[in-house]
Regions:
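Cysteine-poor, low-complexity segments in flexible/peripheral regions
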Residues: 139-181
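Amphipathic alpha-helical polymerization modules
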Residues: 1-137, 177-273
Length: 273
């Protein structure tokens, strides 16, 4: 089969156009860092890219929730620590008040100190955060999603710390009144006070557990976020090594096609002469 000069010419033109397009595309990928220009370039990759973008927005939400819960639990822990210190001092004062040689007048003085400690505990229990929200929340306490399938309580409730089991302020008020009257705290008073301390300590333990769970969830979410970003990069970002190799190859093929065209032009010129 004989191939005409026109067929060779047309083939060379098509080859030049294709290689020029390949060069331009490789240059675009390298300069933009994006593997695809339009979603239609690879519908599957585009669809997966949308899913990955949604996943990234989810991890951004997790980060906001993590920061919120961390700030809340940090404030909770600080208030519980202050309450525990005040209660321990109150308990020590009760032990002192049970000392028989102390006398009625000295117990009344202890009653004044007990009132100051009770007021301090009340202030700690009703403290507010920087946003004006009570650190010990009204029940029920809300939860927040801090990692995939991981929800944590955002705080502790006031009732959980101050009311459930023993009413902390009521117990303190009763004992303070006993001391203010010059009387010695009873065995029941001592038992109630120990129960109050146990109740607050239990709240501290729970806060610590929530903080540990938050740390673990934050670390897990960060690892998953990194994996999602890696998937996105592998799917949508330019592979510089591959794109550079493609550019070199396409440039070489384009130059070869241009050389063929030049020879065709020369041959055509000689034929005309």
């Amino acid at each position: 089969m004989r191939i005409s000069s026109q067929q060779v010419f047309d083939s060379s033109v098509q080859s030049m156009q294709q290689h020029t397009s390949d060069v331009v595309e490789a240059q675009r990928q390298i300069s933009s860092g994006q593997k695809y220009r339009l979603a239609s370039d690879d519908a599957l990759a585009a669809g997966l890219g949308v899913q990955i973008a949604w996943d990234k927005s989810q991890f951004a939400m997790f980060k906001v929730n993590q920061d919120h819960v961390n700030a809340s639990l940090t404030s909770t822990d600080a208030q519980l620590n202050s309450i525990n210190i005040a209660l321990t001092k109150f308990q020590q004062m009760m032990v002192q008040g049970r000392n028989d040689p102390l006398g009625s007048d000295n117990r009344k003085l202890l009653g004044q100190q007990a009132m100051a400690l009770k007021n301090a505990v009340s202030q700690f229990a009703n403290a507010k955060d920087a946003n004006g929200q009570s650190i010990f929340r009204a029940a029920p306490v809300s939860t927040a999603l801090v990692a995939p399938s991981v929800s944590l309580e955002t705080a502790l409730s006031y009732d959980e710390v101050m009311v459930t089991g023993q009413n902390v302020l009521s117990v303190m008020s009763g004992i303070q009144a006993t001391l203010a009257a010059g009387n010695s705290p009873t065995d029941t008073d001592m038992a109630n006070m120990q129960a109050v301390l146990t109740q607050v300590t239990r709240a501290q333990v729970k806060t610590g557990l929530l903080q540990n769970q938050l740390d673990a969830a934050t670390e897990s979410a960060e690892v998953q976020k990194t994996n999602v970003e890696l998937q996105r990069s592998n799917l949508l970002d330019t592979d510089l090594a591959t794109a550079t190799a493609s550019l070199v190859k396409s440039n070489a093929l384009l130059q070869a096609a241009q050389s063929v065209m030049t020879k065709l032009d020369v041959n055509t010129l000689f034929q005309k002469l």
